[in-house]
């Protein structure tokens, strides 16, 4: 009986250590992209397994609205949170986080990975539209061109991964007027009055440019404001 009790205690301790290992492993992976396989799809969340068989959760609200996955599909997502629930590691993934888009750019654009180009800000309405502000520390590198690639070669893969999310890459600048002008692209701006005290800007443009500035469903102006 004492041998059996010892064996049970040992098994429980090993299981506990394994859980701690998974927790610590993923705690270090927060903000990183992982590849997994869809194991189960429920109404409110999806169960994903990594290559070691660890269970990861992708909640519905962290999925792009047009995402459609079935059991056995490969899936790419970013780790956003790791918790312990009832002594079990609970690893939460996201495909809607701006960090996911940032990491996709790092994977596709060597200049970002190497630190020659910095992503200053990312704002997105998942599956619809995103704006990414980038800056280069080397005058010889065009940060926007490097991110888009020849004939869009670098950005196409990212757009596909994000279910055809429309991505605007803009050149970051400390010049507020120029930054606002670029953020509101493709609308052509005539004049900008900046109210520093209230952190507001009045933007003037020709009547035919207004709908472009606002964008479909107000997305362009919403994202420009967030940027």
Residues covered by each model-derived region:
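RNA-contacting regions in translation and RNA-metabolism proteins
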Residues: 1-227
């Amino acid at each position: 009986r004492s041998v059996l009790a010892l064996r049970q205690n040992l098994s429980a301790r090993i299981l506990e250590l394994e859980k701690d290992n998974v927790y610590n492993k993923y705690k270090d992976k927060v903000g990183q992209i992982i590849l997994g396989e869809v194991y189960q799809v429920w109404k409110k969340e999806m169960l994903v397994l990594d290559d070691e068989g660890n269970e990861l959760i992708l909640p519905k609200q962290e999925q792009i609205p047009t995402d459609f996955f079935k059991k056995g599909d490969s899936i790419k997502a970013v780790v956003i949170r790791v918790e312990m629930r009832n002594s079990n590691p609970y690893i939460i993934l996201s495909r809607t986080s701006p960090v996911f888009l940032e990491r996709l750019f790092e994977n596709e654009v060597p200049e970002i990975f190497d630190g020659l180009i910095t992503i200053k800000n990312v704002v997105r309405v998942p599956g619809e539209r995103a704006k990414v502000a980038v800056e280069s520390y080397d005058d010889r590198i065009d940060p926007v061109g490097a991110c888009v690639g020849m004939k869009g070669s670098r950005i196409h893969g990212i757009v596909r991964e994000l279910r055809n999310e429309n991505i605007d890459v803009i050149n970051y600048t400390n010049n507020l007027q120029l930054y606002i002008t670029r953020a509101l692209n493709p609308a052509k701006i005539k004049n900008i009055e900046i109210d520093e005290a209230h952190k507001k800007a009045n933007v003037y443009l020709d009547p035919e440019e207004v709908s472009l500035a606002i964008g479909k469903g107000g997305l362009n102006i919403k994202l420009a404001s967030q940027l």
